[in-house]
């Protein structure tokens, strides 16, 4: 019995090794799980479910095979792929979740999320996030021709990279009080998230008791997952 969590694969055609590693993961470890949760940034960018990128179809088919094998797959949007919609969800068999979800895993209450909303010190990013999550702005963007959406997405990624290069690492990390607030709001002692690309298990205090925050690593030179069993919560790195 095990439930698996992954995040921040940033899949793109320019990184075939990561894609190959993910496909092997889906054909192996994922098939043995009780469930698979993808906590955002599965893709480096997402400009709409109507994008005919062959990579997207390849990944949808691979995830659907896992679902068809009896392993439910769930998805929380990240800051890179927040426009993943119901069309792709149907193609892949994934179930789209809210940005914060509380799970009961073998008697252990766990809060899961992508993690970007915990970075409350980065006010510039939060303002941008609020803007691009505005429903009418999303509808307007998705109504644009694909080639224009590609250009806008490329410019946004370039601007984000430039902005992040001038920010301190502390600003781009989670705010400790935001973490405690989220855990106390959901009455949990465990939190699993991604986004920061700083894999670790942090011990803290929440709800007047010891609590733990488990941060998933990004898939760069190796894979990263959290494996929850009835007996343990493990942060695991593995080769592609």
From Swiss-Prot:
Name by which UniProt lists this protein: UDP-2,3-diacylglucosamine hydrolase
GO molecular function: manganese ion binding; UDP-2,3-diacylglucosamine hydrolase activity
Annotated residues for binding of Mn(2+) 1: 8, 10, 41, 197
Organism for this UniProt entry: Klebsiella pneumoniae subsp. pneumoniae (strain ATCC 700721 / MGH 78578)
Family affiliation: Belongs to the LpxH family.
Main localisation: membrane
Function, as annotated: Hydrolyzes the pyrophosphate bond of UDP-2,3-diacylglucosamine to yield 2,3-diacylglucosamine 1-phosphate (lipid X) and UMP by catalyzing the attack of water at the alpha-P atom. Involved in the biosynthesis of lipid A, a phosphorylated glycolipid that anchors the lipopolysaccharide to the outer membrane of the cell.
Cofactors (names): Mn(2+)
């Amino acid at each position: 019995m095990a439930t698996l969590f992954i995040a921040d694969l940033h899949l793109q055609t320019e990184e075939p090794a990561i894609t190959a590693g993910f496909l092997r993961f889906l054909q192996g470890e994922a098939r043995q799980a009780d469930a698979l949760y993808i906590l955002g940034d599965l893709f480096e960018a997402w400009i709409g479910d109507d994008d005919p990128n062959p990579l997207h179809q390849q990944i949808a088919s691979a995830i659907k095979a896992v679902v068809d094998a009896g392993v439910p797959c769930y998805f929380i949007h990240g800051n890179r792929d927040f426009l993943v919609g119901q069309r792709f969800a149907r193609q892949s068999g994934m179930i789209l979740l809210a940005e914060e979800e509380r799970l009961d895993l073998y008697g252990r209450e766990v809060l899961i999320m992508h993690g970007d909303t915990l970075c409350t010190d980065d006010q510039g990013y939060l303002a941008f996030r609020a803007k691009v999550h505005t429903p009418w702005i999303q509808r307007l963007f998705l109504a644009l021709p694909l080639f224009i959406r590609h250009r806008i997405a490329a410019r946004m990624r370039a601007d984000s990279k430039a902005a992040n290069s001038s920010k301190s690492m502390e600003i781009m990390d989670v705010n400790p009080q935001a973490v405690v607030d989220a855990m106390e709001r959901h009455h949990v002692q465990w939190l699993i998230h991604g986004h920061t690309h700083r894999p670790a298990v942090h011990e803290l205090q929440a709800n007047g008791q010891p609590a733990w925050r488990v941060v998933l690593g990004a898939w760069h030179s190796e894979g990263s997952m959290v494996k929850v069993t009835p007996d343990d919560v493990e942060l695991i790195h593995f080769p592609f």
